[in-house]
């Protein structure tokens, strides 16, 4: 899969990338019905920028291995680059966490999952998007 943020961004700027965002937004709303409308902060780790609300209280966490970009393009920056297994948040501080383009590129998967669990609030929710390694998506 993608190892560089430039490749991921290029994909999301393509027609197939736009279709993917639309489809996954629909899937996310099945898991979180208020995905697009809530004021609850959403932390997106990996490369979640296409799925984050620019006007909301969302934060983007990108892996130092893949690289990072400023987000959003205007206004205060709400993106951070860190090691993929070290989320820069206090224990029990994240109510909703979206991992996308994170797990398939993780060098320390067990540690990543442990840290995700650490930062989630007791009633927090995590959504992990992982490509099927045998599916056609993994060959794009």
List each language-model region with its residue ranges:
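A short glycine-rich, Lys/Arg-flanked "PGG" loop and its adjoining helix->strand segment in the class I
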Residues: 110-125
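Conserved class I S-adenosyl-L-methionine
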Residues: 125-140
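A short SAM/SAH-binding and catalytic strip from SAM-dependent methyltransferases
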Residues: 95-110
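Class I SAM-dependent methyltransferase SAM/SAH-binding core
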Residues: 26, 30-87
């Amino acid at each position: 899969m993608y190892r560089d943020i430039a490749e991921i961004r290029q994909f999301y700027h393509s027609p197939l990338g736009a279709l993917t965002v639309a489809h996954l937004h629909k899937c996310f709303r099945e898991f979180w019905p208020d995905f697009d409308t809530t004021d609850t902060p959403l932390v997106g780790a990996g490369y979640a920028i296409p799925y984050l609300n620019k006007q909301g209280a969302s934060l983007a966490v990108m892996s130092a291995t893949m690289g990072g970009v400023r987000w959003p393009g205007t206004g205060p920056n709400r993106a951070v680059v860190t090691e993929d297994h070290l989320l820069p948040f206090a224990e029990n501080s994240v109510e909703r966490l979206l991992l996308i383009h994170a797990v398939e590129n993780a060098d320390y998967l067990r540690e990543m999952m442990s840290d995700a669990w650490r930062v989630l609030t007791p009633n927090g929710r995590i959504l992990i998007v992982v490509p099927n390694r045998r599916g056609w998506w993994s060959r794009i």
